[in-house]
Design a protein with these regions (language model features):
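Karyopherin-beta/Importin-beta family HEAT-repeat alpha-solenoid scaffold
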Residues: 1-179
Length: 179
């Protein structure tokens, strides 16, 4: 899988598309055939790694990009060692390379995907460690930075910081009541 990821960009776009679709289908089939959580986690990590290495494909296929990110969010709840780290790292890589796609409203969508992500922030990050949450927030920050309209960008930042701000406010209230 490392070799597959390392040749990203080496093929023309159409060949890359056929190649990547075949690889992902085969890996998903392998994931279905494998027994045991350990084996499935290894295959899932490899799938995440590979799709994160092909931003050109992701940018050209919005529905696939959204599906990959949503699957990544599912992996953020997986407790098998290393899977959450890989999910957060892959999300960060995709966020950096495809940032504009998250802040623009895509065809067939009700809103930009960033709004959905921010609305579901707590549900997505609830099982992550503090360091993983940091990686997640940083990734969302990359997306927000790609928003060209300042007022919208400020609204998105406020929404992103809502949970930490509320936690801070509660901490301050608690500290004042203990004084």
């Amino acid at each position: 899988c490392w070799a597959i990821g390392s040749i990203s960009g080496a093929m023309n776009e159409e060949t890359e598309k056929r190649f990547l679709v075949t690889v992902i289908k085969d890996l998903l089939g392998l994931c279905e055939m494998k027994r045991g959580k350990d084996n499935k986690a290894v295959v899932a990590s490899n799938i995440m790694y590979i799709v994160g290495q092909y931003p050109r494909f992701l940018k050209a296929h919005w529905k696939f990009l959204k599906t990959v990110v949503n699957k990544n969010f599912e992996f953020m709840h997986e407790t098998h060692e290393g899977v959450q780290d890989m999910a957060c790292d892959t999300f960060s890589k995709i966020a950096q390379k495809c940032r504009r796609h998250f802040v623009m409203q895509q065809a067939g969508e009700q809103e930009p995907f960033i709004d959905e992500i921010l609305r579901n922030l707590l549900q997505i990050t609830v099982d992550l460690s503090p360091q993983q949450v940091h990686t997640f927030y940083e990734a969302v920050g990359y997306m927000i930075a790609a928003q060209p309209h300042r007022a919208t960008q400020e609204r998105l930042v406020a929404k992103l910081m809502e949970l930490p701000s509320n936690a801070w406010d509660n901490l301050m209230k608690q500290a004042h009541s203990n004084v």
